[in-house]
Amino acid sequence: MGLSEKVEFKTLDGLVLRGFLYSARAKGPAIVMTPGFNFPVSLLYHEVALGFQAAGITALVYDPRSVGRSDGLPRSDINPAKQSEDFSDAITFLKTKPVVDPKRIALWGYSLSAAAALMAAGLDPRVKLVVAVCPAPVPYNFEAPGKRRKYLDLAIRDRESQARGKEPFYVQYIGDSEETALFDYRKQRGMEELEYDEVVENLTKIAPGFRNEVTIQTLRRLGSWSFADVPQRVGPTPVLQVFAVHEELEHIRKTQEAIWAGLTGPKERHTEDRGHMDVLTPDGHRFAHLVKVQVDFVLKNFAQRMR
């Protein structure tokens, strides 16, 4: 953390987003990074940012709106379309930094934020490339039997309740049953034998500010988010898409293959022998190689742009 500084910037709609800037030693390319679904900046993302910084790439990593240190109410109210817009405001902020070449700015995302990064790349011509780690436009199984109707009914009840001045409805994020939570942690690779309290405690340790809940309106937005044509809109922007061999949820695996097939511009595919939840775990040589793959992709493509 000694190689970074705390920063903040405003979104167009007036929220303050907070994070860390890892400035390179000399002027050069930069990359904007945000965590996955309902997750604040953690040690995992700092390790990746340090890898970019060491290679001469300035990295900005920040908490998404309503998560962690960033502003936004209600808390843990996830809005992928707004997260995509926030990427653009982060680019505007980075362009003010003397160490950043404004013509060489990339986006990096994981899970939901990877999908938001791809959407931003299709709408913001300042995005010159994207690193998409295990993109998941809808990171939970909204189509599971009974879930869509259950959550949509709750969302309407919540809107009526909030109209009467009540607090927003929340749903548990990670739990030990899909009946009561979005994710059953026991189905995630490496977590099968853990106790629920241990899982939440570990997440809170690595990501201070983690909240194990999201608003019901989050689910309504994700259920209505149209992502099918986003890969085609990315157009000529180069994309590195990282896959996990042991991606736990079938609907995410299918979506990732559809994203890959839909990308019409320059693209590279890299596969990790991990699951969705542990693909970014700093575990020695494997993780170091994954960071190198990303760094090499960014440097190679930006070098080509300089010719």
Swiss-Prot record:
Q: What is its EC number?
A: 3.1.-.-
Q: Which SUPFAM superfamilies match?
A: alpha/beta-Hydrolases
- The answer to whether UniProt assigns keyword Ribonucleoprotein to this entry is no
Instruction: Tell me which InterPro entries the record gives.
Output: AB_hydrolase_1, AB_hydrolase_fold, Polyketide_trans_af380
Q: Alphabetically list the UniProt keywords.
A: Hydrolase
Does the UniProt entry include the keyword GTP-binding?
Answer: no
Class of this enzyme = hydrolase
Q: Which GO terms describe its molecular function?
A: hydrolase activity
| Highest taxon of source | Eukaryota
Which PANTHER family does the entry link to?
DLTD N-TERMINAL DOMAIN PROTEIN (AFU_ORTHOLOGUE AFUA_8G00380)-RELATED, SUPERFAMILY HYDROLASE, PUTATIVE (AFU_ORTHOLOGUE AFUA_2G16580)-RELATED
Tell me the function of this protein: Thiohydrolase; part of the gene cluster that mediates the biosynthesis of phaeospelide A, a fungal polyene macrolide with a 34-membered macrolactone ring and an all-trans conjugated hexaene structure. The HR-PKS ApmlA uses acetyl-CoA and malonyl-CoA as its starter and extender units, respectively, and provides the large carbon framework in phaeospelide via 16 cycles of polyketide chain elongation, which is the largest number identified in fungal iterative PKSs thus far.
* Family the UniProt entry places it in: Belongs to the polyketide transferase af380 family.
Q: What is this protein called?
A: Thiohydrolase apmlB
